[in-house]
Amino acid sequence: AIGPVADLDIVNDQLTDASMIKWDCLPYDVRSPNPLGTTGFAGGNYRSVPADLHLTTLADPR
């Protein structure tokens, strides 16, 4: 399952098209300064997510 604690680097690797997942659920904006440090949360890196996506909780794509 892909969820809020998933490593975004792994999530990004699994997604070949941003349309595969509905990015409408994390209260973060990838275009804003990373409030949790350079590694983001749960080991992920916000910059590994397409910069044009506005994240508002990661939805499970299943």
Curated annotation (Swiss-Prot):
A biological-process GO annotation: lignin catabolic process
Binding-site positions, Cu cation: 54
Temperature dependence: Optimum temperature is 50 degrees Celsius. Half-life at 60 degrees Celsius is 20 minutes. Half-life at 70 degrees Celsius is 3 minutes.
Enzyme class, first EC level, given as a word: oxidoreductase
pH dependence of this protein's activity: Optimum pH is 3.8 with 2,6-dimethoxyphenol as substrate, and less than 2.7 with ABTS as substrate.
A GO molecular-function descriptor: metal ion binding
Compartments, record wording: Secreted
Protein's UniProt keywords contain DNA repair: no
The EC number(s) this enzyme carries: 1.10.3.2
Domain of life: Eukaryota
Catalytic reaction annotation: 4 hydroquinone + O2 = 4 benzosemiquinone + 2 H2O
Cellular component terms per the entry's GO annotation: extracellular region
Binding note for cofactor: Binds 4 Cu cations per monomer.
Activity modulation comment: Inhibited by sodium azide.
Keyword list, A-Z: Copper, Lignin degradation, Metal-binding, Oxidoreductase, Secreted
Upregulation: By copper ions.
Cofactor field: Cu cation
UniProt PTM: Glycosylated; contains 6% carbohydrates.
Oligomer and partners: Monomer.
Other notes: On the 2D-gel the determined pI of this protein is: 3.85, its MW is: 67 kDa.
Protein family membership: Belongs to the multicopper oxidase family.
Job description of the protein: Lignin degradation and detoxification of lignin-derived products. Oxidation of a broad range of substrates including mono-, di- and polyphenols, aromatic amines and methoxy-substituted phenols accompanied by reduction of oxygen to water.
Stated name of the protein: Laccase-C2
